[in-house]
Amino acid sequence: KTSSVSFIEKNDKGSWGQWSDFVKAELLITIDAKKDRIVVNSPEIQVFTIKSYGDKIESETTKTVPFDCVDNNGSKCKILVITRKDEKNRMQFYINYSELKFVYNIYN
C-alpha cells in the first residue's frame, strides 16, 4: 500500500525540475511475477507489463529492484522498488519515464 505520491518532470530545456510536495495517495500496488505484471490501483488503474527483470542492486544504504516495463499506453518506463536501509527499511516505488517520474511512499 502507498501513503503518498510525488512527481518530477523535465522542463523545456530538458533538465529535471523540482520534486513536487508529497500528497496523500492511499493505493494498492501489486507486483505479479507469474503474469509479468505490475498494477497500480489508482483512480485510473495503471497496468505495467514487465519486459525484463533487472538484477537487484544493494549498497550499504539501499536495496533496489528494477523492472523494465511498458504501460497500458505502450510507453516504456523503468520501475524501481527501493528499500532505504538507513531509514528503517522505508520503501519507495518509482515509475520513471524519459520525461516524467513518480515516486510512491510504501508501507506494509
What are these regions (language model features)?
Residues 26-31, 53-55, 78-83, 104-106:
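Hydrophobic/aromatic beta-strand elements that line small-molecule binding cavities or substrate pockets
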